């Protein structure tokens, strides 16, 4: 959220606090899908069923130094750029956020085939990063690796921020968000961890064909796999061997 530097007034602050305290407790409806942002006020909210994808871009050595190597920064930017581009191409993706080395998306998935589409989105991101690594290998000594977490469940969607200013945003809360974020940290962490980590409920909603691409990771209590998009993968073999 970009600041707009409005004067802080204690009287107005107390009024805003009182409005939040006095807001009704029954104004949080449960929905099967994600409503428009315009439906949100500073006193209501929605419990919505959704799918969440977190992409953890494991940082190349030196990226957090005070003067990161240019090649590392370019590699990071390319991964963030294309992860966002792939998520944005999915019409069910309603929210995209970037915090440090993590790109996340919230998807409206009222039908099981929509969950499969999110799984396909993750596979495309995995494949595009393989292409990025191939493109960078002549100029960059580092290689980008990912950890991806996919989860399905209920999230709380609320508007939060400074009422009366432009410093507001939609906030997503709930176990489904935390679960996807945690699973992403497991991706490629240990030799037994694959790149794409999928929650049990997300796995349950996948097609039988997609389920076959994953195996049980009993240590992480999830399913995992190294899943690529066949079209992207074939392009890489032909154009970036």
Named regions from a protein language model:
Residues 111-229:
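Catalytic beta-strand-to-alpha-helix segment of the class III nucleotidyl cyclase homology domain
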Residues 6-32, 59-78, 118-132, 147:
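Charged, low-complexity, helix/coiled-coil-prone segments
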Residues 26-28, 32-35, 39, 44-47, ...:
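Mixed-charge, polar/low-complexity N-terminal
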Residues 3, 13, 22-23, 36-39, ...:
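Generic serine detector
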Residues 36-120:
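Catalytic NTP-binding/metal-coordinating core of nucleotidyl cyclase/transferase enzymes
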Residues 1-39, 179, 188-241:
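Intrinsically disordered, glycine/charged-rich C-terminal tails and inter-domain linkers
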